[in-house]
Amino acid sequence: MRFGFHLFMVPPEELQAIARTADEYGWDSIQVADAPFFPEKVSVPYPYTPDGSRFWPLDMPVLDPWVAITAMAVVTQRIRFIPSVLRLAIRQPLLEAKSLASVAAVAQDRVALGVGLAWMPEEFRWLGIDMKTRGKRQDEAIQAIRLLLQGGFQEFHGKHVDFDRVIMAPTPKKKIPIYVGGATPPAMQRAARLGDGWLSVIHNKDEIPAIVAELNRYRRDYGRENEAFDIMLHCPDATTVDDIKRLQDLGITDLQVTPWAIPGMAAEEGVGKIMQQQPTLQMKQDAIKRYADTVIAQFI
């Protein structure tokens, strides 16, 4: 089992110090958010809270994920970084491939790409993209980015992504994993079909056996059941070593936790409680060290 955490709602000035601490104490990965902007009003409910509300302050600072990752990569040696998730359907894949390859060069390939579908119609409308095409657009973008990262001249001709032979340099020295996020069947199917793994939203531990079975079924459907596949799970109520070992036995490869969160919180209330805590940088660093000493050490 590998361990990581997400830096959503963490002040930008704390990122490097937190990354250095996690790197020193044996964490595997850090995830960062992607949010180009937050509309004051949205026309659809947020899909991951019971009442559809957005749980974060709209003026919360969110760095561009590639900037945040680069800032942390230059002060660390080992830990990996993952945008989770990059809203790929609203982004231009040639430019995203360039950003990813550039960050990979700076980070010595300690980066993966986590992608997902943006959920706000306003994002698509104001960026001039037809939201109805987002699934197919993302499929093509994933395939095009994979090609571009291979090096040499590449071309791609899809309905939404279309370019003649181009070359991009530098390119990564090793394969950069692409993880697909989302809780819906189409998202999980996309992960099984095109991804090197799946990124979860927040789930409780009693949901996990059915989720893993569903992912494995889709992988068999696409003939990929024998390929390596990471499952990166965010499960706040997996609080004990025994809980985590049971998840590992189910096939979970990576557990995303919030080490400074309140132990035992339910998934649906976790984020709100974390916000109420407003932990200091020192509290976060102490929690990162404590979790590494008491939990991660059991899996080395």
Predicted regions and their residues:
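Active-site-adjacent structural elements that line small-molecule/cofactor binding pockets in enzymes
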Residues: 1-300
